[in-house]
Amino acid sequence: MRYDVEQPSKLDRVRADYNVHYWSQGFFGIDDQGEVYVSPRKDKAHQTQLSSIVKQLEARDLNLPVLVRFPQILHQRVHNICDAFNQAIEEYDYPNKYLLVYPIKVNQQKEVVDEILASQAELEHKQLGLEAGSKPELLAVLAMAQQASSVIVCNGYKDREYIRLALIGEKLGHKVFIVLEKLSELDLVLKEAKSLGVKPRLGLRIRLASQGAGKWQSSGGEKSKFGLAASQVLTVINRLKAENQLEALQLVHFHLGSQMANIRDVRNGVNEAVRFYCELRELGAHIDFFDVGGGLAVDYDGTRSQSSNSMNYGLHEYARNIVSTVSDVCNLYGQPRPVIISESGRSITAHHAVLITNVIGTEAYSPEEIPAPGADAPMLLKNMWRGFEEVQHGTDDRALIEIYNDTQSDLSEAHSQFATGVLNLEHRAWAEQLSLRIYHELRQKMSNKNRFHRPILDELQERLADKFFVNFSLFQSLPDAWGIDQVFPVLPLSGLEEMNDRRAVMLDITCDSDGAVEQYVEGQGIESTLPVPAWTSDKPYLMGFFLVGAYQEILGDMHNLFGDTHSAVVNINDNGESEIAFINEGDTVEDMMRYVHIDVDKIRTNYRQLVSQRVAKEEQETVLAELELGLSGYTYLEDF
């Protein structure tokens, strides 16, 4: 019997190419019109095209680039994480509760923190707390924590002022855990607590031997910057006993590192840390809270793997591993199960923000007819032409590789001969154009099925890729892509029903060769170029940079004085319509100048003097108005 297998549609292949289903967690997708949509509640009722949101923003006189926030996604992520732990607690009959603590360092923007807190505003028993890692963050958190469970975790190195602020938080009715990162902090806490008449709540950050893998592995292990070694932990216990303050120790904390890709590393770290908890309980410490820190990963590339940009587990598996490990070890020791805390800031915030901007121009290679070299042409050029004829008229797979290598060598020799005066400028230009044409022909003839061709094809894709000049600063909006090779999903927002027959690289508008996106999610892997529909100058070409809600804004720098982009908070109503709730305008040129201590008033004075001296009187007002418009304008490109 014959069965007909339904072939995937073109749009299904496009969806697979960009791997949207997996990295987006259902919050984004590609509809049947080839448009990228957002669905904050993961249903069709609350689904709208991102390009339609751009039109709304433009109607409000907001130029691209714009960082678009979807607060409903923040609400959904908080619910998903809490629900995963609550289910695990029920599944393992765990006799205590879970608390999700948001470290505001991940994204301190007020509208972000407010929405995270609002996600549980209607709940009687809230499962949210806040974490601060510095004095400024603590001051911000003290004013917000009453909207959550009033639990505050204080991490980071601390001075007298930081500690006094934390203790004052107790006077304000908060439950403030001062986590000791080094031994010297203990004396300071005890001294200031006595001075203020406050009973401190202490936590210990344990320096584990367990260590994860990836970009942040140095956060864990014996060489970690933070935490107390086993001998130091015992010193703290003995000191607290001597001061009759052992009851102040209420929390054990550890942190293996951000973006833990392998669930086995998570389980090993929890197993080691919960033994610290049990041992400390046996020494008389009445610890009730077990803080596993951060580490819950985001699947940036959607491959569900152990790569540093992914994770080989799901949210429910993460929760089950932590709850079951804590429960099993406590059973062995006969100790009560503690309240479990996680500081899962990246997982809460990454999905909620998308940077949307426009392509302002391209540089693309198109094959062109190249004349054969003349009889008196240098021998090097004639050799190159023979290679071109070979690849045109067909040859075997092995010869294709030889032609590629010969072309590489010949082009290098052409550059050398130009530098020594053997070849002139026309010769060099001809050699470069012919080599591109040969590369183009080789790309058509080589196959990914041939493993010897694959590395060459990758190189050819890069050489022949279109260059998309995109209106943004990599250093401001995607600093982790530059600094630590973090992968962020990138794709066009419209026209995906068309042929994705071009490949491109994204280049920003800074005057820096590092301002380029070098890694792209494609299918189940990472590539150096991205499949895209062809760019045309007669219609806008929108690009979206996804999963940028964690760390990117606060880490972004001001290279070339490109400042913060505009941002907009957008909700999707029950009719699938987008509603702009809030707009925060980005930096102007004047803002950036003042930030680097340039006296803008003096600049204006100098302008006026120069204009009065050099410009005709009837033009002076117009010229000064142009200069003033430049100072008040957006730092990104507006007219092109």
From Swiss-Prot:
Q: Its catalytic activity?
A: L-arginine + H(+) = agmatine + CO2
| Requisite cofactors | Mg(2+); pyridoxal 5'-phosphate
Which amino acids does the record list as binding substrate?
A: F290, D291, V292, G293, G294, G295, L296, A297, V298, D299, Y300
EC class of the enzyme, as a word: lyase
The protein's matches in CDD domains, at most eight in alphabetical order, are given as: PLPDE_III_ADC
What does the record give under GO molecular function? arginine decarboxylase activity; metal ion binding
Residues with the N6-(pyridoxal phosphate)lysine modification? K105
| Assigned EC number | 4.1.1.19
Entry keywords, A to Z:
Decarboxylase, Lyase, Magnesium, Metal-binding, Polyamine biosynthesis, Pyridoxal phosphate, Spermidine biosynthesis
Q: Name one GO biological process term.
A: spermidine biosynthetic process
The protein's matches in InterPro entries, at most eight in alphabetical order, are given as: Ala_racemase/Decarboxylase_C (IPR009006), Arg_decarb_HB (IPR040634), Arg_decarbox_C (IPR041128), Arg_decrbxlase (IPR002985), De-COase2_N (IPR022644), Orn/DAP/Arg_de-COase (IPR000183), PLP-binding_barrel (IPR029066)
- Function field: Catalyzes the biosynthesis of agmatine from arginine.
HAMAP family found in the cross-reference section: SpeA
| Similarity field | Belongs to the Orn/Lys/Arg decarboxylase class-II family. SpeA subfamily.
Q: Which PANTHER family match?
A: ARGININE DECARBOXYLASE, BIOSYNTHETIC ARGININE DECARBOXYLASE
Name of the featured protein: Biosynthetic arginine decarboxylase
The scientific name of the source species is Vibrio cholerae serotype O1 (strain ATCC 39315 / El Tor Inaba N16961)
* Organism lineage string: Bacteria, Pseudomonadati, Pseudomonadota, Gammaproteobacteria, Vibrionales
Q: Which gene encodes it?
A: speA
